[in-house]
């Protein structure tokens, strides 16, 4: 049989394109901002992870330009060999001080970070225990490791304890959870997770891709939000969301970080973060430190949007209803209905992300909306009016 046979067979993507409701790969002709030019038309952006709006901040953009002029376009090598810039070390040092974790390792992307951390830390005789709604990169890391993976029902602490009880006493265990869940916008039950980890001798890793710049003191993330910075062993995060760039990181003790530097194949065998991306991430981090009010503004706008949607009759996923995060999922349930609604909203000038199974449970398709500290109430009202109108028309 031809290994490419699957490429020629019918697929959901081909079906959606034929039906005129394919929702992916829309091209922008502008900067990533609260309003964008997308496919030749002005759209209000409610689908970006640019939570602090820093992709267009002048100091961030200028830092990238200066780095290109000083270091050139790329590093042409691994951090392990010729690809370490002085600026990489500065970024790691300043991020470590900000997160209050001395051991920082930076990776090329957030996805690569999870794969690189988990595959290095979880050995053949270890167990990794995951929330079912964790990001796909966490599962990729589990698959690349030699350990045994166990999963617990989403935010179900009784089921987490049940999985911990399955780990033999002589084996190591790592609990991995999103801090803020990327689809649902709800927050992990970190106090309970840390308590169970302590009881059963497990370690805790938090993927804070959507928590950095969003939660905690000055935007330090989910562990800071709960006052559990000393009880979370490993943070993972990304530079592509609140820090307006590209890349990812691990924050831990210096001993754990040093081990990962020498054991993580994705770290050792990948080129380092390019100069412009490194510089913009560092500039965005400094901007966040100088302007912690952005975190408060983001929270305020997120609450404004939640109230506005509820008042307009939109059904927000219950677990995210009162969460102080900028991710607000609107239930639309059936796949084709969701795509039709998303297309109509898009055609009327608002970009949202339709999210379908398997990214959601079957029958629970939704519109994932997300917000920036640089949105205005007037823009949100305009967007929410359009969404509510379309949802009523498609009931």
Task: Enumerate the language-model features and the residues they cover.
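N-terminal "arm"/small-domain region of PLP-dependent enzymes with the aminotransferase-like
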Residues: 5-73, 202
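Conserved PLP-binding catalytic core of the aspartate aminotransferase-like
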Residues: 296-303, 310-349, 359, 364, ...
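PLP-dependent enzyme catalytic core of the Aspartate aminotransferase-like
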Residues: 3, 58, 62-66, 70, ...
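Active-site C-terminal subdomain of aminotransferase-like
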Residues: 200-203, 210, 215-324
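Conserved PLP-anchoring active-site segment centered on the Schiff-base-forming lysine
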Residues: 117-136
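Conserved N-terminal alpha-helix of the aminotransferase class I/II PLP-enzyme fold
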Residues: 62, 66-110
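Active-site phosphate-binding strand-loop segment of PLP-dependent enzymes
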Residues: 150, 154-206
């Amino acid at each position: 049989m031809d290994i490419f046979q699957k490429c020629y067979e019918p697929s959901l993507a081909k079906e959606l394109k034929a039906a005129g409701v394919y929702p992916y790969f829309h091209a922008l002709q502008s900067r990533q901002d609260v309003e964008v030019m997308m496919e030749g038309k002005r759209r209000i952006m409610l689908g970006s992870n640019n939570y602090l709006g820093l992709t267009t901040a002048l100091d961030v953009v200028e830092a990238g330009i200066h780095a290109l002029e000083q270091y050139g376009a790329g590093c042409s090598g691994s951090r392990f060999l010729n690809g370490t810039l002085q600026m990489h070390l500065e970024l790691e040092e300043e991020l470590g001080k900000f997160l209050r974790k001395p051991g920082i390792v930076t990776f090329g992307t957030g996805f690569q970070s999870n794969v690189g951390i988990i595959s290095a830390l979880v050995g053949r005789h270890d167990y990794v225990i995951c929330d079912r709604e964790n990001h796909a990169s966490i599962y990729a890391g589990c698959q690349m490791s030699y350990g045994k993976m166990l999963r617990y029902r989403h935010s179900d602490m009784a089921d987490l304890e049940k999985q911990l009880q399955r780990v033999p006493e002589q084996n190591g265990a790592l609990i991995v959870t999103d801090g803020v869940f990327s689809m649902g916008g709800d927050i992990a039950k970190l106090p309970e997770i840390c308590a169970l980890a302590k009881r059963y001798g497990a370690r805790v890793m938090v993927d804070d891709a959507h928590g950095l710049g969003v939660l905690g003191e000055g935007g330090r993330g989910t562990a800071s939000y709960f006052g559990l910075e000393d009880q979370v062993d490993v943070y993972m995060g990304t530079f592509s969301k609140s820090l307006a760039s590209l890349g990812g990181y691990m924050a831990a003790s210096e001993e754990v970080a040093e081990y990962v530097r020498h054991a993580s194949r994705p770290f050792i065998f990948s080129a380092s973060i390019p100069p412009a991306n490194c510089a913009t991430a560092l500039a965005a981090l400094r901007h966040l430190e100088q302007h912690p009010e952005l975190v408060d503004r983001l929270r305020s706008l997120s609450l404004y949007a939640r109230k506005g949607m509820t008042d307009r009759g939109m059904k927000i996923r219950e677990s995210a209803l009162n969460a102080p995060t900028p991710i607000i999922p609107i239930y639309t349930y059936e796949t084709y209905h969701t795509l039709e609604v998303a297309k109509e909203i898009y055609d009327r000038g608002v970009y949202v992300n339709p999210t379908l199974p398997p990214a959601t449970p079957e029958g629970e398709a939704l519109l994932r909306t997300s917000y920036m500290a640089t949105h205005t109430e007037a823009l949100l009202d305009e967007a929410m009016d359009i969404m509510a109108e379309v949802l009523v028309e498609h009931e």
